[in-house]
């Protein structure tokens, strides 16, 4: 589940910065919720193609590759080749760790720009691109601050990060425009529990990005420093200091074939 961000220095976010590695790790865990369904819908586990040559494009922390490794039978992995590519060296650090810990067979990790891979055409039998964009809306915490402050909804935030990839009809249209056949698109919803401390940390990491996009400079000067504590109070008040925060994760799973 890739990212389309607004332009301009105040609204820009370097999602490949080291500070966001932990946030991507959470995104990777959420991605794993849906990876089995994506892989199953692709038909790869039952593919008769030999050898399998798989690209995990924009692999992030290696969530899809990890599920692939545990899903595909040893007979198919004996002569397959798996390439994990991402633009960020920081993200690939996590993928390399997973590759070594889980002893992936015939796998390589390399820098790849998802928008311009420069990889050979018609080389791969299967290509997966799965990206998770998790954002804390902060809306409830913002409304507890004084001042008439914009409290963006989840839909408004996703309108910044996820343009064109958050509606089934739009995703289908993109696949059709790219020349895919046998297109299947469906929405899947799952629940994910996150430790409160991790939830709060992820929210506070994103505060500068959210307020830079939706608040004026005067609003940031007056209230941004108060927002981290407001987040702590709201989340701990709702879930308890040592509790688990419940998140509802939603994914659009889309597959298609090219001949």
From Swiss-Prot:
Methyltransferase; part of the gene cluster that mediates the biosynthesis of aflavarin, a bicoumarin that exhibits anti-insectan activity against the fungivorous beetle C.hemipterus. It comes from Aspergillus flavus (strain ATCC 200026 / FGSC A1120 / IAM 13836 / NRRL 3357 / JCM 12722 / SRRC 167). Transmembrane segments: none annotated. Gene3D superfamilies: Vaccinia Virus protein VP39. Belongs to the class I-like SAM-binding methyltransferase superfamily. Induction: Expression is induced by the developmental and secondary metabolism regulator veA. The keyword Metal-binding does not apply. Keywords: Methyltransferase, S-adenosyl-L-methionine, Transferase. Its EC number is 2.1.1.-. This is Methyltransferase afvD. InterPro entries: Methyltransf_25, SAM-dependent_MTases_sf. GO terms for molecular function: methyltransferase activity. The keyword tRNA-binding does not apply. Pathway: Secondary metabolite biosynthesis. Pfam families: Methyltransf_25. One of its GO terms (biological process) is methylation. Disruption phenotype: Fails to produce aflavarin.
């Amino acid at each position: 589940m890739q990212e389309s961000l607004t332009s301009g220095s105040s609204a820009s976010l370097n999602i490949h910065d080291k500070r966001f590695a932990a946030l991507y790790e959470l995104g990777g865990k959420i991605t794993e919720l849906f990876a089995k369904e994506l892989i199953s819908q692709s038909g790869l586990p039952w593919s008769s193609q030999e050898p399998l040559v798989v690209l995990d494009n924009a692999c992030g922390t290696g969530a899809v590759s990890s599920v692939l490794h545990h899903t595909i039978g040893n007979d198919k992995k004996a002569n397959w080749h798996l390439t994990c590519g991402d633009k960020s060296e920081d993200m690939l650090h996590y993928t390399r760790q997973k590759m070594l810990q889980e002893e992936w067979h015939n796998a390589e990790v390399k820098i790849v720009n998802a928008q311009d891979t420069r990889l050979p055409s018609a080389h791969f039998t299967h290509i997966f691109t799965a990206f998770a964009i998790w954002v804390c809306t902060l809306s409830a915490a913002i409304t507890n601050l004084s001042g008439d402050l914009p409290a963006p909804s989840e839909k408004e935030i996703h309108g910044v990060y996820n343009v064109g990839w958050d509606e089934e009809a739009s995703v289908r249209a993109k696949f059709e425009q790219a020349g895919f056949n046998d297109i299947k698109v469906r929405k899947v919803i799952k629940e994910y529990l996150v430790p409160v401390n991790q939830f709060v940390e992820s929210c506070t990491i994103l505060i500068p990005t959210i307020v830079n996009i939706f608040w004026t400079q005067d609003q940031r000067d007056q209230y941004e420093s108060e927002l981290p504590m407001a987040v702590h109070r709201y989340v701990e008040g709702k879930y308890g200091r040592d509790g688990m925060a419940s998140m509802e994760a939603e994914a659009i799973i889309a597959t298609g074939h090219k001949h």
